[in-house]
UniProtKB/Swiss-Prot annotation:
Signal peptide: none
Classification lineage: Eukaryota, Viridiplantae, Streptophyta, Zygnematophyceae, Zygnematophycidae
InterPro entries linked: Cyt_b/b6_N, Cyt_B6_PetB, Cytb/b6-like_sf, Cytochrome_b_N_euk/bac, Di-haem_cyt_TM
Primary localization: plastid
Gene this protein is translated from: petB
Name of this protein: Cytochrome b6
Amino acid sequence: MGKIYDWFEERLEIQAIADDIISKYVPPHVNIFYCLGGITLTCFLIQVATGFAMTFYYRPTVAEAFASVQYIMTDVNFGWLIRSVHRWSASMMVLMMILHVFRVYLTGGFKKPRELTWVTGVILAVLTVSFGVTGYSLPWDQIGYWAVKIVTGVPDAIPIIGAPIVELLRGSVSVGQTTLTRFYSLHTFVLPLLTAVFMLMHFLMIRKQGISGPL
């Protein structure tokens, strides 16, 4: 085992990376409220794991979506637990994100030189809400259907460009299979990818600039 570690150490300098992480200075004013961002990240990772597990059984069609969710809940081993954890961690992620934003704002973490960190955080907040909107529709029950119909119909009030935006979101004039397909693609591929990219940027900037000082 030692020889394997030495082989990787010689090429990747693992110990130097570990020492840099461990030796990072943590200001004395940091308290439990500074952990809210990390908790949000943990919830996201739980979402990815449980969501990936459900993709093996979920069917993104208007005819089979609801039945496939019921199948996950009743027939798949621990399916009820996986979906429940997915839902609970989704709610927790939104709550922790909101509390994290308040903490950063109240402690002045958005001020120079951390403006870009704040911008990426706001983008992540928008992506988090988008997860909720797209995921809500996937069971394709009455609540999900009407939620999608209302949300995608909001831009219709915008003059000139409203109707094209609605059609872009729905995939057609009305809510149907193309809408579910688009929301499924957004929820399982586009949004996770964007979130991972912006989270990486967010944490790299925090790593570079450090945690903001007390007010």
